[in-house]
Amino acid sequence: MQLYPAIDLRSGRVVRLLQGDFAHETRYAKNAVELAKHYEAEGANWLHVVDLDGAKGEVAGAIENLNLIEEIARATSLKIQTGGGVRTEADVRQRFGAGAARVVLGSVAVKTPELASHWRDIFGAEKLALALDARADPFGVYRVHTAGWQETAEAELFECVARFAAAGFKHALVTDIALDGMMAGPNVALYVKLKEVSAELLVQASGGVSQLMDLRALNANGISGVIIGKALLEGKFKLSEAIAEVAA
């Protein structure tokens, strides 16, 4: 199972949101480049970077964050997976130009899947990942959310996964919004179901990881990757311990 330590950026600062809510932002007194170097020293080979300003359409902060992505790429040998505010082909190329190894497509893929497929043809399935962020509605149906989780799409999560897998996509980052930043454990059953729906799409679990036991459960169920953010920032465990856990 591939581990992706995460850095969320807002105006160049390392932050975390609670369930994607910008009104519930925690700022960390950590330099993004130094944090990336620390994760590399702990054994990381991938880094997940989210441009929160880009997701909100705030240009000044997005420029600052892009510069930081470029700095991280220069300062480390980490493979960077990054998303947030990717809306056009120029945005995709800009992220690759900054040193990203993989670009995450969120709202644009859900709203205009034919455009996402066009970019897959241009850049290749290995270079792109889908961000499918979902929350269960009152009937227990997981609905995909877009626009920084502010809008609910009509799309049902499992239908989306099956459709994108059939279209030739390879990677998908799936967040259970209700668990994001809650440190309450991941929704293992959800990821197992996603794997059953489409084994071809390699799913990265995001949201809720708070202890090594969570990683053990995901790994035991054959989940291909996991995003770890708040747990590392708040010292619940070290990345080196997490790597050893999934390698055991």
Please provide the spans of the model-predicted regions.
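Charged helix-capping and loop-helix junction motifs
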Residues: 60-70, 153-158, 184-192
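Glycine-rich phosphate-binding active-site loops on the catalytic face of alpha/beta enzymes
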Residues: 94-115, 176-179, 207-214, 221-241
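Conserved anion-binding
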Residues: 15, 19-23, 96, 100-180
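Catalytic cores of alpha/beta
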Residues: 76, 80-102, 189-226
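Glycine-rich, proline-tolerant flexible connector loops at the mouths of alpha/beta enzymes
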Residues: 46-67, 107, 173-184
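Short, acidic/polar
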Residues: 28-40, 87-93, 153-163, 215
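Conserved, mostly hydrophobic/aromatic
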Residues: 8, 39, 47, 95, ...
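Structural preference for beta-strand elements that scaffold enzyme active sites
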Residues: 2-6, 46, 77-81, 101-104, ...
